């Protein structure tokens, strides 16, 4: 799907869910800054992260492509496991489900896993 225009809202809509983040997209995002928007009462609260690792994973099913992205973010605010609006300044917005996977001195790592028919 084409570029999804950034919104000032953290709201997730059908257009955002329909946009597939592909392996090619993930490779372009490697080591790039991305922002997750946390829904708030009045406005979205941005959490700036860095794409720390992009890795393709083997699939037992034919024609299925699998990969993961690890995002490195600040200690606070901590994002819980859920789907967020993720924004890249040049590539636009996606709906991405992330899970916190590790906490170290000064940062928290989050992972998103993807799988789609290639």
Regions found by a protein language model. Give the residues of each.
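C-terminal segment of N-terminal export signals and the immediately downstream linker at the start
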Residues: 2-37
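Short solvent-exposed loop/turn micro-motifs enriched in small/polar/acidic residues
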Residues: 27-29, 77-80
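Short conserved beta-strand and strand-loop elements enriched in small hydrophobics
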Residues: 32-41, 82-89
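Conserved hydrophobic positions within beta-strands
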Residues: 51-53, 98
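Short, solvent-exposed secondary-structure boundary/capping segments
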Residues: 57-69, 105-115
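Short, compact, well-ordered microdomains
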Residues: 83-118
